[in-house]
């Protein structure tokens, strides 16, 4: 990847109150897209509250670019049914990556991110220092659907030779 500034590890933890697309349930999976990169979680059968706990890693060239998360109901013989989507604004997370972590204690809050028109946060999100890493836990409110949220965690991974902050 040209002009790679780092890697973004996205841990897709779980879905909350996702819509039912197959009678009383769904077989959801998540597709994460940024530019030409497209990754997906495994599917979870018969659940509107799936536990994925899958880790997906994207190469980041432009931290101003949004990451799109789409949830689908897996169908075997027909096209997958959409179950909502959300955008992840990684810019606030990227902006704190230059923080000097040597003086931080475990659990230190670095920044709070409030829900806004620039993100799909269902509630305020905290960027914290934990076990030597800067992490952000988020609950994303799905759009274009009756109900549903997805809980994720993001982590920045520096790449040798990438530009410094």
UniProtKB/Swiss-Prot annotation:
The keyword Nucleus appears for this protein: yes
Residues annotated as binding Ca(2+) 2: 22, 27, 73-75
UniProt superkingdom: Eukaryota
Residues reported in the UniProt entry to bind Ca(2+) 1: 21-22, 73, 75, 81
Listed SUPFAM superfamilies: C2 domain (Calcium/lipid-binding domain, CaLB) (SSF49562)
UniProt-listed SMART domains: C2
PTM annotation (N-acetylmethionine): residues: 1
Alphabetized UniProt keyword annotations: Abscisic acid signaling pathway, Acetylation, Calcium, Cell membrane, GTPase activation, Lipid-binding, Membrane, Metal-binding, Nucleus
Gene Ontology CC: cytosol; nucleus; plasma membrane
Signal peptide positions (record): none
Subcellular location(s) per record: Cell membrane; Nucleus
The keyword Acetylation appears for this protein: yes
Biological-process GO terms, alphabetical: abscisic acid-activated signaling pathway; positive regulation of abscisic acid-activated signaling pathway; positive regulation of GTPase activity
CDD domains: C2_ArfGAP (cd04038)
C2 domain span: 1-106
Alphabetized GO MF terms: GTPase activator activity; metal ion binding; phospholipid binding
Disulfide bonds: none
Function in brief: Stimulates the GTPase/ATPase activities of Obg-like ATPases. Mediates the transient calcium-dependent interaction of PYR/PYL/RCAR abscisic acid (ABA) receptors with the plasma membrane and thus regulates ABA sensitivity.
Family (UniProt): Belongs to the plant CAR protein family.
Quaternary organization: Binds to PYR/PYL/RCAR abscisic acid intracellular receptors in an ABA-independent manner, both at the plasma membrane and in the nucleus.
PANTHER family in the record: PROTEIN C2-DOMAIN ABA-RELATED 4, PROTEIN C2-DOMAIN ABA-RELATED 8
Protein name as annotated: Protein C2-DOMAIN ABA-RELATED 8
The organism of origin for this protein: Arabidopsis thaliana (Mouse-ear cress)
């Amino acid at each position: 990847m040209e002009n790679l500034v780092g890697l973004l590890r996205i841990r897709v933890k779980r879905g909350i109150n996702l819509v039912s697309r197959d009678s009383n349930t769904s077989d959801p999976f998540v597709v994460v897209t940024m530019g030409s990169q497209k990754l997906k979680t495994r599917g979870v059968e018969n659940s509107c509250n799936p536990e994925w706990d899958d880790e997906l890693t994207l190469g980041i060239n432009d931290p101003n670019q949004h990451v799109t998360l789409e949830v689908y109901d897996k169908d075997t013989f027909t096209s997958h049914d959409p179950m909502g989507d959300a955008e992840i604004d990684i810019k606030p997370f990227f902006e704190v990556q230059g923080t000097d972590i040597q003086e931080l204690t475990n659990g230190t809050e670095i920044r709070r991110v409030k829900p806004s028109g620039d993100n799909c946060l269902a509630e305020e999100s905290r960027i914290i220092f934990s076990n030597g890493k800067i992490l952000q836990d988020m609950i994303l409110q799905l759009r274009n659907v009756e109900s549903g949220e997805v809980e994720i965690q993001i982590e920045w991974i520096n790449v040798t030779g990438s530009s410094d902050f």
